[in-house]
């Protein structure tokens, strides 16, 4: 029970830590963007214990699905498992703490290439009904998507926040201010994580001061509301983008195979023509060289020349 209590306290303490300044919050989001498939509390605890993590999974998944063994002495990342009646701990390991064995493989981690950005931009514009003014660049589109998604679910994510605000800095703020600040913080946080995972620089549109109100969420009880909003919305959009990137990459690979096959076919035909030309030239050369009409190696009967006995 003591270890479970330690992790609960770690979550509380780290929530205060990452909300203590805009830079600390951005540091947390750098980790969360890489691990967007995890819920907020898991992201928070992973950042507290292994901030450089890139791909985390259970020991069983690494061993049985990926055929990767966890390194001797590696420390598991403790997470809170609250799915059952009683909260318990579960452990995950980052890929950096594993190594491949025979038949092992690495997880697929999609990466958006620069030449794919235009197609992703087109997809986002169609999927989210973006206006033309929001499709100048991929960064513009991601900001518009973040703004739209937060606005659509704002009431859901704010529900209950006023009751959790007791004893926090939010307690002294009026409802309109809390609502406005939450909406802006959530939008900017979603945008930040989308950009980070897509390989873009979020600070081209943002400034550090845009996250100044994060310090009002100085306890886990209220930070969870903001964290859940940013995490869940980011996950939804990034899953969509990831699938689109994968689809584009598969199509590019298919075209490359077709081009390669066509190139090989053309090379094969060229080689056949060249070989035929060489054979024709060879026949002409043999027929025009000295000796008999049958060349120098064959007798008139078509066999090898009969050797004369040694004298």
Positions of predicted regions on the chain:
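N-terminal accessory/interface modules of nucleic-acid-binding and processing proteins
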Residues: 1-276, 283-284, 289, 294-311
